[in-house]
Curated annotation (Swiss-Prot):
PANTHER family: ADP-RIBOSYLATION FACTOR GTPASE-ACTIVATING PROTEIN AGD2, CENTAURIN/ARF. ANK repeats lie at residues 683-712, 716-745. A zinc finger (C4-type) spans 482-505. Residues 2-226 form the BAR domain. The keyword Aminoacyl-tRNA synthetase does not apply. It comes from Arabidopsis thaliana. Probable GTPase-activating protein. Gene3D superfamilies: Ankyrin repeat-containing domain, Arf GTPase activating protein, Arfaptin homology (AH) domain/BAR domain, Pleckstrin-homology domain (PH domain)/Phosphotyrosine-binding domain (PTB). It comes from the Eukaryota. One of its GO terms (cellular component) is cytoplasm. Keywords: ANK repeat, Coiled coil, GTPase activation, Metal-binding, Repeat, Zinc, Zinc-finger. GO terms for molecular function: GTPase activator activity; zinc ion binding. This is ADP-ribosylation factor GTPase-activating protein AGD2. Residues 290-421 form the PH domain.
Length: 776
């Protein structure tokens, strides 16, 4: 009540009351907005708590709540510890939500429904009392002098009662308004500060909880990173195995095709004269069973329908032939694909399906053995129209089988024939194995036994192409060891960097991206190693390339600059025995950061552009390589305009569009007209244009490997392909077309490459014409 100087009912008093009521109404609006915000905040906290709990439950379902091998392999026991932490954090969020509800929302609701509402009700009662008081006063003052005394006394009493009620309601209204004025000074501050204290406790509890878990989290992250690196290595090795397998399969297919004898198709017994020494070697080579051949064959059923069923056949080195069929409730498509896979593949996914698919069981694969000791193999079938069939005839049953191709059929026939021979001679071989063991090392393998002389030469040429590449490249200085870790006998290479490396370092090079390093195998990617690539590597080699990329290492003894020493201290060359992470760090620093490259800071980019232009014109492969590596900017697409201040006759001040178009037409160029050679006008030409004019295939290959723009246009709109056609260099033109050059680009005269070539006369190179026509 201290805000009211005078408590008498006066206009000043009423003004103060109206002012307080206005403040209360404004406060009510603010409280309603705050109420909505608090409700949303509580809802968000509740959803967050529920979401964290759901996330924890899903993690438990994912694997943390099980002890099966799949759960263990994905880190279920580790995740379970994180789940407990997440649930604890969820309880903290729920605690914070309850604090917001009790400390803020309930008090805010009470303030709105009790205090503010009481002020509203007090105003309503006050207005009613004012009305009653006004009526009583009007009645009393309107009495005449001759009014009876009892009536005067009655109205006077009513007036006094109305005035008393008026005063009471007046002070009740003031009290309720002053209560609001008093509470607003501490109610909201107290509630909101309590909420902030609850937030502090919430985050402190979370921090304490996660601080205890921090060492464990870092330990798991370290383990995961190591597992990731190991997985990369294993994936690279697996990719190499796949490539080797595919290469070997192709060679086996070629070998089987070479062995195919047309005389065998006539129905004669395929009892090929397999040398005894090969049979002996196969029989006594190992005491354990090993798979000689396995794969799918179509088997004709013995039913009246005589339909074909796809079965998985396995032939081992002891002469046993098995086939498998799926007897589970799988669909025909699944049976067609997965028949026998769980037993003879690597087994990971087969075991997973068997364990987790309820419709399958451990006995879903039916295995059958064919006794080869009393069997005979023939290449025909009852239906002579079928080309790829052969039969295994035994006293018990005749098996009619069909392969996917002729080479596969002959491979099966030859290996089953050898298995029959093994079974027939097994008793004899067991009597004196020592004698045959002595002959093992001198026996020739069956792979080329039945090849003609020309077939053997072709086969050996294909087989040794990888060895030839290895021999050529390893004779280059420094190429006998890995360029990154000095591991002996590297069998991988980077095409654009010109270095050889081991398989482990090749994995790091792949991660750099093909714009940094294009990794290829010396033995598997046989089509890559064209003569031009080999010549490029002869010009470079590990020795020279590392003298550029590792120049700081090579000058360690003579370098006295502190900056260089610091760089070497942070990046040291690993050995072949070092961890993968050390090799990765070194290779990244070497090629991504160029940490070991000696750069001349005084040499500007314009100087580097001029020097590389001179090196290209002089065809100095090593200088070009060194300048590209040492340049801070990308100078591979340097133009003639970048090194020369052009103020030549092409720069006329002509505004007419026709004149401008005519000026760009190469036929209108005076220099080209005078010399009849496109090379005499270099305006706008790039390094690749000059390389095409030089006729040096190694120079062209180097620029393409480093990403030179193959479709860059000169002042006359001509691409390097235009220059090759204009100079009659068809070999270079075909190289550019195979590497992505677009012959549809028109020069300044509006003609494409094909049109320019036809303008020069008939195109006698048929391959060039086809390439131009296909890409047009």
């Amino acid at each position: 009540m201290a805000g009211f100087i005078n408590l008498e009912d006066s206009p000043m008093f009423q003004k103060q009351v109206f002012s307080l009521e206005g403040t209360s109404d404004e406060l009510k609006d603010r409280c309603q907005k705050l109420y909505k915000g608090v409700k949303k905040f509580m809802g968000a906290l509740g959803e967050a708590s529920t979401g964290v709990s759901a996330f924890a439950d899903s993690l438990e379902e994912f694997g943390a709540g099980h002890d099966d091998p799949v759960s263990v392999s994905i880190g279920g026991p580790v995740i379970s510890k994180f789940i407990n932490t997440l649930r604890e954090l969820s309880s903290y969020k729920e605690f914070l939500r309850s604090q917001v509800e009790h400390v803020l929302l309930e008090r805010l609701t009470n303030f709105m429904t009790v205090d503010l509402q009481e002020a509203k009700e007090s105003r309503r009662r006050f207005d009613k009392a004012v009305h009653s008081y006004d009526q009583a006063r009007e009645k009393f003052v309107s009495l005449k002098k001759n009014t009876r005394g009892d009536i005067v006394a009655e109205l006077e009493e009513d007036l006094e009662n109305s005035k008393s009620a008026f005063e009471k309601s007046r002070f009740n209204l003031v009290n309720s308004l002053m209560t609001i004025e008093a509470k607003k000074k501490y109610e909201f501050l107290e509630s909101i500060s309590a909420i902030m204290d609850s937030h502090f406790k919430y985050f402190k509890l979370g921090y304490d909880l996660l601080s205890q878990l921090e060492p464990y989290i870092h330990q798991v992250l370290t383990y995961a990173q190591q597992s990731k690196e190991q997985s990369k290595i294993e994936q690279d090795r697996f990719a190499q195995r796949i490539q080797e397998f595919r290469t070997q399969s192709e060679l086996d297919s070629q070998q089987a095709s070479a062995k195919a004898d047309p005389s065998d198709v006539g129905g004669n017994h395929v009892y090929r004269a397999i040398p005894r020494k090969n049979v002996e070697a196969n029989s006594v080579s190992t005491a354990d069973k090993e798979v000689t051949k396995q794969g799918y064959l179509l088997k004709r059923s013995a039913s009246l329908r005589a339909d074909w069923k796809r079965r998985f056949f396995v032939l081992d080195n002891h002469g046993s032939l098995y086939y498998y069929r799926n007897t589970g409730n799988k669909s025909a498509k699944s049976q067609h694909y997965y028949s026998g896979l769980g037993e003879h593949s690597s087994g990971v996914f087969g075991r997973f399906r068997t364990r987790h698919n309820r419709s399958a069981s451990q006995g879903s694969l039916d295995c059958n053995m064919i006794d080869l000791r009393t069997s005979l193999i023939k290449l025909d079938a009852e239906d002579t129209d079928l080309r790829l069939c052969f039969r295994i005839i035994s006293p018990q049953k005749t098996y009619t089988l069909q392969a996917e191709n002729g080479a596969d059929r002959m491979d099966w026939v030859n290996k089953i024939t050898a298995a029959i021979t093994i079974r027939l001679n097994s008793h004899f071989l067991q009597q004196s194995p020592a004698r045959y063991l002595d002959k093992k090392n001198t026996s020739s393998g069956p792979a080329t036994e039945n090849l003609t002389l020309n077939q053997k030469e072709d086969y050996n040429q294909r087989l040794n192409v990888g060895d030839d590449v290895l021999t050529i490249l390893r004779e280059i200085p420094g190429n006998n060891t890995c360029a990154e870790c000095n591991a002996p006998d590297p069998d991988w290479a980077s095409l654009n960097l010109g270095v050889l490396m081991c398989i482990e370092c090749s994995g790091v090079h792949r991660n750099l991206g093909v714009h940094i390093s294009k990794v290829r195998s010396l033995t598997l990617d046989v089509k890559v190693w064209e003569p031009t690539i080999l010549d490029l590597f002869r010009n470079l080699g590990n020795g020279y390339c590392n003298s550029v990329w590792e120049e700081l290492l090579h000058h360690l003894d003579d370098d006295s600059e502190k900056g260089s020493t610091d760089t070497l201290a942070s990046v040291s060359k690993p050995s072949s025995e070092d961890w993968f992470t050390l090799k990765e760090k070194y290779i990244n620093g070497k090629y991504l950061e160029k940490a070991l490259v000696v750069k001349d800071e005084r040499e500007a980019n314009s100087t580097a552009s001029s020097r590389i232009w001179e090196a290209v014109q002089s065809r100095n492969i090593r200088d070009i390589y060194r300048l590209i590596v040492k340049a801070d900017a990308n100078i591979i697409n340097t133009k003639f305009d970048d090194i020369t201040d052009l103020d030549v006759y092409h720069h006329h001040h002509v505004d007419a569009p026709d004149e401008v178009k005519k000026r760009h037409d190469p036929n209108a160029c005076q220099r080209i007209k005078n010399s009849n050679e496109a090379r005499n006008c270099l305006q706008g030409c790039s390094l690749l244009h000059v390389a095409c004019q030089s006729g040096d295939p190694i120079l062209l290959e180097l620029l393409l490997q480093f990403g030179a723009d193959i479709n860059m246009r000169d002042y006359h709109g001509r691409t390097p392909l235009h220059h090759c056609i204009a100079s009659g260099n068809n070999a270079f033109a075909k190289v550019l077309l195979r590497r992505g050059a677009r012959p549809s680009i028109e020069d300044g005269g509006g003609l494409s490459v094909l049109e320019r070539a036809m303008e020069m006369g008939a195109i006698t190179d048929e391959e060039l014409f086809l390439l131009l026509a296909e890409c047009q």
